Amino acid sequence: MATNHLVLSGTITRSRSFHSPSGIAHSVIMLEHKSQCYEAEMLRNVYCQMQVILSGERFESVTDKLKIGVDIEVQGFIALQQSRNGQNRLVLHAENVELKT
């Protein structure tokens, strides 16, 4: 079996919550990550934005705390998602979320 596990920390820049027609609670946030990492013995600035999806009852207790400007760490798996306009992007499906502030 292939491995698919990602840990990413950052600041929430957008957040929305909704329930699917089947009644499942979902939160969709945009996570902005900034860090510095070494690559080929050179310090490199790293920046990315990634959409994070939190689904199910286990996240209902934290959903109200997921506001713009809050720092979090997310663990989960990545998957390809196609938007309504046909563009593909990677999204992070959360399995664990930890508030950092």
Swiss-Prot record:
Keywords: DNA replication, DNA-binding, Primosome. Disulfide bonds: none annotated. GO terms for molecular function: single-stranded DNA binding. Coiled coil: none annotated. One of its GO terms (cellular component) is primosome complex. Residues 1-101 form the SSB domain. PROSITE patterns: SSB. InterPro entries: NA-bd_OB-fold, Primosome_PriB/ssb, Prisomal_replication_PriB. GO terms for biological process: DNA replication, synthesis of primer. It comes from the Bacteria. Involved in the restart of stalled replication forks, which reloads the replicative helicase on sites other than the origin of replication; the PriA-PriB pathway is the major replication restart pathway. During primosome assembly it facilitates complex formation between PriA and DnaT on DNA; stabilizes PriA on DNA. Stimulates the DNA unwinding activity of PriA helicase. Belongs to the PriB family. Homodimer. Interacts with PriA and DnaT. Component of the replication restart primosome. Primosome assembly occurs via a 'hand-off' mechanism. PriA binds to replication forks, subsequently PriB then DnaT bind; DnaT then displaces ssDNA to generate the helicase loading substrate. HAMAP family: PriB (MF_00720). This is Replication restart protein PriB. The gene is priB.
